[in-house]
Design a protein with these regions (language model features):
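Generic short beta-strand segments
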Residues: 51-56, 80, 156-162, 188
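Non-transmembrane domains of secretory- and envelope-associated proteins
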Residues: 5-11, 140, 151, 168-169, ...
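An acidic-aromatic
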Residues: 65-126, 192-195
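Flexible, processing/modification-adjacent segments and terminal tails
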Residues: 28-35, 43, 95-165
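Short, hydrophobic/aromatic-rich segments at coil-to-beta transitions
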Residues: 44-51, 70-76, 148-158, 179-184
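Glycine-centered tight beta-turn/hairpin loop motif at sheet-sheet or coil-to-beta transitions
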Residues: 57-59, 82-85, 103, 164-168, ...
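N-terminal leader/targeting segments and the immediate start of mature chains
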Residues: 2-72, 204-220
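A short, surface-exposed beta-strand/turn
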Residues: 67-69, 90-95, 169-186
Length: 220
């Protein structure tokens, strides 16, 4: 009798655990699917500006400004180490890509030497190929509500999609509830914040600097 009662209790406990896991996974899947749908219109935009600030260490900061308007692209990378800045700007006119490098000692222009601009990887870290993948990656995920720079966000931890950048010990994406845009990324000790503009990029942004101020490095 005691054995049967014990087995019944164990069965009830297992059932409760299974139900809790199902509820957890269904909730996460619904939230993530909703964010995927909301961000889609922004991911398809060809008129935008993304600013990403990454604190790599106490003395090192990386600032990325990425602009696109139709076929025109501009990517500005600034790396600041102990208050010394290196700035690299890539201008894509649609026919070629020109690179301008600035340090405290020199300015160098390289015209047509780069084949591709690689900027901010994605507007969303929640990319999956299908619903089954979303469900699978939702299982270990932890989601809570947070505020990032006055934006209401979901803090999504351990969504371990192969399309994401992943930390060794911590992977956290804070994603705006209203738009699905990622506002903050935490990969271990590295913290990145992002800001966005859409449908408001002026052509003047893509005007290259005065090349006479630079040393021209010939294409090899």
């Amino acid at each position: 009798m005691k054995i049967k009662k014990g087995l019944k209790i164990i069965g009830i406990i297992i059932l409760i655990i299974v139900v809790l896991i199902l509820v957890h996974t269904i909730r996460n899947t619904i939230i993530i699917s909703d964010l995927q749908n909301k961000v889609e219109k922004y991911s398809n935009s060809n008129n935008y500006h993304i600013k990403a600030i990454t604190h790599i260490s106490e003395n090192t900061t990386m600032i990325i400004n990425q602009y696109q308007k139709n076929e025109k692209q501009l990517l500005i990378l600034e790396r600041i180490v102990n208050d010394e800045k290196v700035k690299i700007s890539y201008y894509n006119t649609g026919s070629r890509i020109d690179m301008f490098t600035e340090t405290k000692d020199e300015k160098i222009a390289e015209l047509g030497k780069v084949n591709e601009i690689l900027g901010v990887s994605s507007m969303t870290p929640l990319q999956t190929d299908n619903l089954w993948q979303t469900i699978l990656y939702s299982l270990p995920t932890r989601i809570k509500t947070v505020k990032v720079n006055d934006y209401e966000c979901y803090s999504i931890n351990d969504f371990l999609s192969p399309y994401n950048l992943l930390g060794k010990n911590k992977t956290e994406y804070d994603i705006e509830k209203e738009t699905g845009l990622v506002r903050k990324i935490v990969l271990d000790e590295q913290i990145t914040t992002r800001e966005y503009e859409f449908e408001n990029i002026d052509d003047s942004v893509f005007v290259e600097p005065d090349i006479s101020q630079y040393t021209l490095k010939e294409k090899e």
